[in-house]
């Protein structure tokens, strides 16, 4: 069987990994083996982080909406139920923005939800 020489491919792979590891501390930016381990871990953490970010933002929006609705005399879950009954389809991100930037408009939304809960 013929001997496989991987000089070009190995050099290309090493350069790619070391480029990704640029800025890492010590041997993690200089030595291929440790750099490769660090890069694999970093890419995995970045992948997981992108998914966790979505959860974190949703929790933040809900906490903001809950705080604003309680200031207007209603709980978050009853507010969302009232909004659904009223046929208002505004997502949580926009509701939290309204709660922060326009409290008067948000108070009107809470009143609308209360009206549909009692009806």
UniProtKB/Swiss-Prot annotation:
InterPro entries: Ribosomal_bL20, RIBOSOMAL_L20_CS, Ribosomal_protein_bL20_C. PROSITE patterns: RIBOSOMAL_L20. The keyword Ribosomal protein applies. GO terms for molecular function: rRNA binding; structural constituent of ribosome. Pfam families: Ribosomal_L20 (PF00453). SUPFAM superfamilies: Ribosomal protein L20. GO terms for cellular component: ribonucleoprotein complex; ribosome. Coiled coil: none annotated. GO terms for biological process: ribosomal large subunit assembly; translation. The keyword Ribonucleoprotein applies. Keywords: Ribonucleoprotein, Ribosomal protein, RNA-binding, rRNA-binding. Belongs to the bacterial ribosomal protein bL20 family. Binds directly to 23S ribosomal RNA and is necessary for the in vitro assembly process of the 50S ribosomal subunit. It is not involved in the protein synthesizing functions of that subunit. NCBIfam families: rplT_bact. PANTHER family: 39S RIBOSOMAL PROTEIN L20. This is Large ribosomal subunit protein bL20. The gene is rplT.
